[in-house]
Amino acid sequence: MFDLSLEVLRVVENAAIASARTMGMGDAKTADQAAVEAMRHCMDTIPMDGTIVIGEGERDAAPMLYIGEKVGAHNSGSRIVVDIAVDPLEGTNLCATGAAGAITVLAASEKGGLLHAPDCYMEKIIVGPAAKGAVDLDAPVKQNLKSIARRLQRGIDDLVVVVLDRERHKTLIHDIRDAGARIRLISDGDLSAGIAAAVAGTGVHAVMGSGGAPEGVLTAAALRCLNGEILARLVVKDDAQKERMQQMGIRDVTRIYNTQELAPGRALVFAACGVTDGNLLRGVRFTGDGIHTQSIVMTTSKPAVRFIETTHLENKPDVKVRFR
């Protein structure tokens, strides 16, 4: 597959800038819509035949970037066929309130390279490269923490586990604390936390709990590039949801997926851009010297992880680019 990393970077940067202009205004829906529109417009300039496999929802519930939507400059004659997963603004409430951790995210692969996950919850445990292979989704929390600590050559009391602050995690939170590990509760943004768990120096050693299945697939795409690991299982709410999963080709709803199974693509591209400051990426900064963004772009076909600082000049002739 043609290297789309710089094109994908441009998409998440434009979405981040658009949503950052709404930051702190208290309107999560407007922030998300700004990111969606910017992302859609930018993707339609890329010479590719793209299909949204994870997006804003079903066609009848999302005006743009719905599952099955075609994107790309179709009149370019391109034969680059790609599946695309997007979270135009992960942490819409974070952006609306000006809180830390909002990012824009896109992953792409050859056709069939990303699991078509239903919009439901997914149990997850996420660790970095050092603890890869040491955890078990069905194991007791304390056992997993012992295994992670052993791999990281530290005590359990030196571990930091990120958990979404939800009522459903009450028992999980108790078990983590009872084992002696520390917890960082977050209101939103488990995708960003999952990436941070696989990057040394972020202060995050694991992510546990249930969150969105689409975010789980996006996290898996990032972890394929970072050599991290996610183990996940879909959470079935009722018979109607089970039937919907089976219609999407998921026969065994109790199956535990690993990183490779969630994102099996041979040519994965993953990009994220900070909207507000977070553990991994700085947020968008509007200055007299242009607009500054910080992004991460990763690929598997030519393994590389790039942290990119960009100054967007906005066609202003008097803007000065400074050495940083």
Regions found by a protein language model. Name each.
Residues 7, 11-18, 22-24, 29-30, ...:
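Anaerobic metallocofactor- and corrinoid-dependent redox/one-carbon enzyme cores
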Residues 44-45, 70-79, 87, 95-99, ...:
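Solvent-exposed alpha-helices and their adjacent loops that cap or buttress functional pockets
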Residues 189-190, 199-227:
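Glycine-rich phosphate-binding loop
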Residues 105, 110-186, 248-251, 278-285, ...:
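Acidic beta-strand-loop-alpha-helix segment within the catalytic core
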Residues 88-97, 102-104, 170, 191-195, ...:
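Short glycine/serine/threonine-rich phosphate/pyrophosphate-binding segments
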